[in-house]
């Protein structure tokens, strides 16, 4: 039998088979998910831990103020979770007219009045309470540790970080959290996200799991 041993691809891939796989766009997040598996946690625990780390290492794409969605099969039943933030209760036509004038026809582009109530963190708590095995504090531990110790910024994240600085730096709290040196972190620079670590610790205190 003739067989062509020439590999048509520039690199070779070794097939790996496993019972548990955690896949993310950042290795530290995948590592956090796997660590929950090693602790005896399940897929929900791993997903929450990985998602929390993503808000630290890729905050320009996955922030604590984001939304969350989940489709989960528990072995018997399919569950769906929609944690897209709802509109704040005060968002009425009169509210925007009082604050931005009678000609205001839409919410502003930036600032607190431009976003819905964040749903991501509350979704983590809800999923952990109903489907998780590990304490919620354990799930947040890797993200808090990385935020406090710091991590090295990759090129793509640095580019996204630096792009909107001129537009966002005047917003309350933005510069303190994201521009501690008065600028976006450089590629390869160690960034310590202490504001996010503080926020995650506060959430642990309010969670009932």
Set out the residue ranges of the language-model regions.
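Noncatalytic scaffold domains of N-terminal-nucleophile
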Residues: 1-31, 35, 43-206
């Amino acid at each position: 039998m003739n067989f062509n041993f020439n590999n048509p691809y520039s690199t070779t891939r070794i097939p790996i088979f496993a019972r548990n796989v955690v896949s993310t766009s950042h290795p530290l997040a995948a590592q956090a998910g796997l660590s929950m598996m090693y602790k005896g946690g399940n897929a929900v625990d791993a997903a929450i831990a990985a998602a929390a780390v993503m808000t630290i290492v890729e905050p320009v794409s996955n922030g604590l103020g984001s939304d969350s969605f989940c489709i989960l099969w528990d072995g018997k039943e399919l569950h769906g979770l929609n944690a897209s933030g709802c509109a704040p209760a005060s968002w009425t036509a009169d509210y925007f007219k009082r604050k931005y004038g009678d000609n205001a026809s839409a919410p502003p582009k930036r600032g607190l009045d431009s976003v819905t109530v964040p749903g991501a963190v509350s979704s983590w708590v809800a999923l952990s309470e109903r489907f998780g095995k590990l304490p919620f504090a354990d799930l947040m531990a890797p993200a808090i540790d990385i935020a406090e110790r710091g991590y090295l910024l990759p090129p793509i994240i640095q580019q996204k970080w630096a792009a909107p600085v001129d537009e966002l730096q005047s917003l309350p709290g933005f510069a303190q959290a994201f521009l501690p040196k008065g600028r976006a972190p450089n590629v390869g620079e160690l960034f310590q996200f202490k504001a996010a670590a503080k926020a995650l610790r506060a959430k642990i205190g309010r969670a009932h799991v």
